[in-house]
């Protein structure tokens, strides 16, 4: 049907007859000469039909060309010629195709939007097949395709085995909410769609496969946002007989190589490492964006003698924190804007946001200055490094809560004051706490997942005695404030796994019912093993330069968890429900 792609026609083909196929991007009738921009997945080439040529066929061609509409599907035969007016904006701009035949393969109905428009997201998702024709969307999808291909090449080259794991599996409700599938042949029982292949890949290590990977589809029934979908894709990896450093060194090299191959992006030769504690202290986040040159500064020692109750209460509390954030040139903020920052931090748990504004010329404006002696307040600002023209914000209260809202403030200030540099800043965050205490549930929860090994603790009694302070062998790869990969060294001894389940409030009977197959596998000579999973959607979005992963997923769901193109989810007939032994119940208002 075609001999060449539109976007690959060049000067080497001048004088040759070619057959092309594609869509009508633009059709222009300029007084007897018709110009058609014919588009396929490789690009655009200009097709010319001149009614003034001494050829009966040309007048017929001109009639066809004159009647074309946007997105009509064509087959064109013609001769490649040098173009008189070169178009440097397209790669085929030095040539054109003088048409000798045009066949309309399919007429397009009037479009809800044109390929060169950028309509609202709902209409784009409803007509996703039209949205994906847009050059920008084609570019982003190709970025994703190249990313996956490059990852596969690298892993295949290093002896990893691509092994599929089940999509219909057992519900293990320890993370997000599962998607459940009724088991028709087992009335009243359900499969679950996998939130990750975590347990299967560990069992593959027990089975002796040594190096595993999979481009895995994962499913989590959770609230959606710009960087989260109900179904998503991850590069899942696992290694036998490795330490944390073995895993990190390998995937660091892989990510450096893939970023350069896919997008020409040069990442640091060695990624810096930062403990979870340091990341929270300096940046108020376990996924710090190092492009923003702002840090939180602990000032508890300098405010302890003040009479400002929020500060002194935080200093007196064993888990309290008083932190400051200096924003260079931030004194331009009005009182209204400062109040907006306070309202913003309130979303993250702040009960107030103190400040000190150092005018370029004049006095310091601060509602908390009266609670300090003049020398003490000057010493506080000096310790922070505040200069004329700056503003300093203060947060006080529970350590984790202060870290969270001051970290959020740091990110917002970085954006608002254009402090984010245009580079790539990867790092490893390590030494996460093994557990978090859930006040509401009155029990420990795993910070990573229940299968992560504790660090520097081999004795079960020691783990029980130091559960609050125990660190895990977990690690995250962070890039520009995004967690792009997370992994750990796993528990490979069944008695340690049982102890962790116990600390998480999972009884022996529950552990056997939910994870008995894993505990059994660990009994039969499980090797030390570890791994990592990378978010393909998130990495593709970063490389493509978009803030929403929906742009790099061919058929994403809306934030309302719907597919507007197929109208999913949809109702099911009573007959189908009966076959799978399910009765639906609408929620009460």
UniProtKB/Swiss-Prot annotation:
It holds the Pfam family tRNA_anti-codon. One of its GO terms (molecular function) is nucleic acid binding. Belongs to the class-II aminoacyl-tRNA synthetase family. Type 1 subfamily. It is an enzyme of class 6 (ligase). Its main location: cytoplasm. Gene3D superfamilies: Bira Bifunctional Protein, Domain 2, GAD-like domain, Nucleic acid-binding proteins. SUPFAM superfamilies: Class II aaRS and biotin synthetases, GAD domain-like, Nucleic acid-binding proteins. The lineage of its organism: Bacteria, Pseudomonadati, Pseudomonadota, Gammaproteobacteria, Lysobacterales. This is Aspartate--tRNA ligase. L-aspartate binds at residues 174, 220, 448, 490. Its EC number is 6.1.1.12.
């Amino acid at each position: 049907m075609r001999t060449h792609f539109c976007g690959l026609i060049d000067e080497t083909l001048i004088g040759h007859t070619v057959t092309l196929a594609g869509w009508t991007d633009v059709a222009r009738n300029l007084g007897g000469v018709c110009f058609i921009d014919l588009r396929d997945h490789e690009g655009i080439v200009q097709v010319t039909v001149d009614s003034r040529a001494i050829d009966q066929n040309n007048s017929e061609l001109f009639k066809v060309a004159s009647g074309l509409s946007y997105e009509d599907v064509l087959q064109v035969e013609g001769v490649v010629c040098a173009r008189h007016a070169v178009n440097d904006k397209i790669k085929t701009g030095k040539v054109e195709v003088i048409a000798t035949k045009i066949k309309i393969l399919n007429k397009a109905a009037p479009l809800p939007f044109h390929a060169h428009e950028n309509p609202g997201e709902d209409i784009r998702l409803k007509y996703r097949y039209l949205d994906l024709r847009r050059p920008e969307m084609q570019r982003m999808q190709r970025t994703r395709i190249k990313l996956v291909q490059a990852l596969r090449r690298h892993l295949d080259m290093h002896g990893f085995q691509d092994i599929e794991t089940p999509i219909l599996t057992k519900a293990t409700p320890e993370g997000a909410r599962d998607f459940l599938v009724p088991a028709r042949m087992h009335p009243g029982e359900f499969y679950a769609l996998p939130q990750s292949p975590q347990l299967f890949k560990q069992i593959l290590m027990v089975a002796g496969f040594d190096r595993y990977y999979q481009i895995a589809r994962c499913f989590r029934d959770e609230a959606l946002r710009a960087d989260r979908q109900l179904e998503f894709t991850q590069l899942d990896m696992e290694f036998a007989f490795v330490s944390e450093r073995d895993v990190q060194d390998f995937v660091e090299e892989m990510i450096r190589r893939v970023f350069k191959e896919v997008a020409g992006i040069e990442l640091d030769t060695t990624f810096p490492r930062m403990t979870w504690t340091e990341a929270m202290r300096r940046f108020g986040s376990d996924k710090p964006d190092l492009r923003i040159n702002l840090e939180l500064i602990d000032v508890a020692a300098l405010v302890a003698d003040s009479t400002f109750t929020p500060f002194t209460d935080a200093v007196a509390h064993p888990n309290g924190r008083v932190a400051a954030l200096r924003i260079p040139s931030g004194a331009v903020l009005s009182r209204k804007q400062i109040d907006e920052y306070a309202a913003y931090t309130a979303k993250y748990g702040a009960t107030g946001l103190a400040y000190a504004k150092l005018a370029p010329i004049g006095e310091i404006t601060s509602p908390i200055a009266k609670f300090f002696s003049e020398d003490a307040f000057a010493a506080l600002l000096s310790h922070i490094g505040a200069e004329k023209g700056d503003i300093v914000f203060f947060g006080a209260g529970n350590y984790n809560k202060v870290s969270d809202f001051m970290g959020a403030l740091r990110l917002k200030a970085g954006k608002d004051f254009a402090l984010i540099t245009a580079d790539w800043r990867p790092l490893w965050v390590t030494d996460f706490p093994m557990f978090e205490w859930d006040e509401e549930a009155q029990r420990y929860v795993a910070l990573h997942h229940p299968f992560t090994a504790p660090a520097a603790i081999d004795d079960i009694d020691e783990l029980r005695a130091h559960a609050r302070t125990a660190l895990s062998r977990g690690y995250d790869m962070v890039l520009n404030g995004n967690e792009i990969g997370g992994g750990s060294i796993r528990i490979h001894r069944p008695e340690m796994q049982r102890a962790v389940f116990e600390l998480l409030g999972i009884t022996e009977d529950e552990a056997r019912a939910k994870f008995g197959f894993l505990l059994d596998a660990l009994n039969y000579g499980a090797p030390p093993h570890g791994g990592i999973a990378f978010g393909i959607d998130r990495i593709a979005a970063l490389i493509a330069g978009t803030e929403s992963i929906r742009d790099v997923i061919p058929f994403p769901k809306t934030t309302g968890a719907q597919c507007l193109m197929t109208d999913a989810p949809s109702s099911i007939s009573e007959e189908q429900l009966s076959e799978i032994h399910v009765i639906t119940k609408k929620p009460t208002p």
